[in-house]
Amino acid sequence: MNDVFLKALPVLQKLTTAGFEAYFVGGSVRDYLLNRTISDVDIATSAFPEEVKEIFQTSYDTGIAHGTVTVRENNEFYEVTTFRTEGTYEDFRRPSEVTFIRSLEEDLKRRDFTMNAIAMDEHFALQDPFSGQLAIQNKEIKAVGKASERFHEDALRMMRAVRFLSQLDFELDKETEKALESQIELLQHTSVERITVEWLKMMKGKAAKRAIELLLKVKMETYLPGLKDEKSALSEFASWDWEKRTTEESIWLGLVVAVKPNNVNAFLKAWKLPNKTIQLVNKAYQYALNMKETWLTEELYHAGKAVFSLVNELNVIRGQENNQHKVSQAYEALPIHSKKDLAITGADLLKWSGESAGPWVKETLDKVECGVLSNEINNEKIQIKRWLGYHEE
């Protein structure tokens, strides 16, 4: 049995000893059945939140309104959630009310897909009322109950369906795909932040190409930031070898290279990306657009290591030769890597000239920077002083 389950077993045992039902549920059970890596577990119980808190010495109300209490056991923290049913979904994401219940099957009934609606008890016996194991055997993503109802409850489940297809290399069953296509406009009610998380998970999957093909088939791109009417660009994007990807930034660089938005900055901001990512991708864009392989000294210097590494990564994804080692060597051989590396400063110029500060200081430093980069002069203080025409003291 997986160590993650064994470590969390005392939580289940404490709950069952107190007379309640308790199970491992959701993604951890699914991944166990698929022999995938399990990082953490979700625990569901018939004990109500106040009852859970009485059983464990240390607990925190992390999601008490939805029945979730975080408990500490053997210096580890576990989320324990009470079985529940949910009322109507008024915003296509959150239920209007949550009711705590004692029935496992009723709790599993509200979950998204049958493969995620399997529970495992403390003896590692499975409870599978919706035939999730069969779906896993058939490599099928099938909604619990009516797919249209599940998607209406939380529109993000449509994006999750496509993401699971990519991660697991599964297929959607016919009813689930039909509901996905007919209700795709509901995705507009989902926050961009949640969509971005699912997009990245999808792109990191082993079947990203098939996932994008399905995404286009159901017209999901219409509701993704900046991708409306970009079917041909996304088809090109999907054709690249994304299994060679090593960074998240390459996904975004690839997307802007394929789409070629008028305003790269605005396009990336629409996905609510961190400023650091936006700046890096924006800087790399023009170089990547030309699939740059050979770099001039000045280009290498102004681009910097992060940019040329990212451009090279996308080149590899697009089928070009990996030039990282060669370009890195050329970069390391540069006499300076930024203006800060110059052997002189503005203070030196003021001292040597006896003049007041002004625009000329920056202009002179720019001139020295170019001279050093072109190997016209060595980056040594005395040589630079002579080169600028200042006499020795």
UniProtKB/Swiss-Prot annotation:
Q: What is its EC number?
A: 2.7.7.72
- The residue stretches assigned to a coiled coil in this entry are none
**Which reaction does this chain catalyze?**
a tRNA precursor + 2 CTP + ATP = a tRNA with a 3' CCA end + 3 diphosphate; a tRNA with a 3' CCA end + 2 CTP + ATP = a tRNA with a 3' CCACCA end + 3 diphosphate
Molecular function (GO) terms for this protein are:
ATP binding; CCA tRNA nucleotidyltransferase activity; magnesium ion binding; tRNA binding
Q: Which cofactor does it need?
A: Mg(2+)
Quick one: which residues bind ATP?
G27, R30, R111, D154, R157, R160, R163
Q: Write out the residues that bind Mg(2+).
A: D40, D42
Taken from the record, one Pfam family name reads: tRNA_NucTran2_2
Q: Has keyword RNA-binding?
A: yes
Q: Where does CTP bind?
A: G27, R30, R111, D154, R157, R160, R163
Q: Which residues cross the membrane?
A: none
Q: Which UniProt keywords apply?
A: ATP-binding, Magnesium, Metal-binding, Nucleotide-binding, Nucleotidyltransferase, RNA repair, RNA-binding, Transferase, tRNA processing
- Show the HAMAP family listed in the entry: CCA_bact_type3 (MF_01263)
What the protein does comes down to: Catalyzes the addition and repair of the essential 3'-terminal CCA sequence in tRNAs without using a nucleic acid template. Adds these three nucleotides in the order of C, C, and A to the tRNA nucleotide-73, using CTP and ATP as substrates and producing inorganic pyrophosphate. tRNA 3'-terminal CCA addition is required both for tRNA processing and repair. Also involved in tRNA surveillance by mediating tandem CCA addition to generate a CCACCA at the 3' terminus of unstable tRNAs. While stable tRNAs receive only 3'-terminal CCA, unstable tRNAs are marked with CCACCA and rapidly degraded.
What is the additional note? A single active site specifically recognizes both ATP and CTP and is responsible for their addition.
Tell me how this protein assembles: Homodimer.
Question: According to its UniProt record, which protein family does this protein belong to?
Answer: Belongs to the tRNA nucleotidyltransferase/poly(A) polymerase family. Bacterial CCA-adding enzyme type 3 subfamily.
Question: What's the protein called, per UniProt?
Answer: CCA-adding enzyme
| Organism expressing this protein natively | Listeria monocytogenes serotype 4b (strain CLIP80459)
Q: What is the lineage of its organism?
A: Bacteria, Bacillati, Bacillota, Bacilli, Bacillales
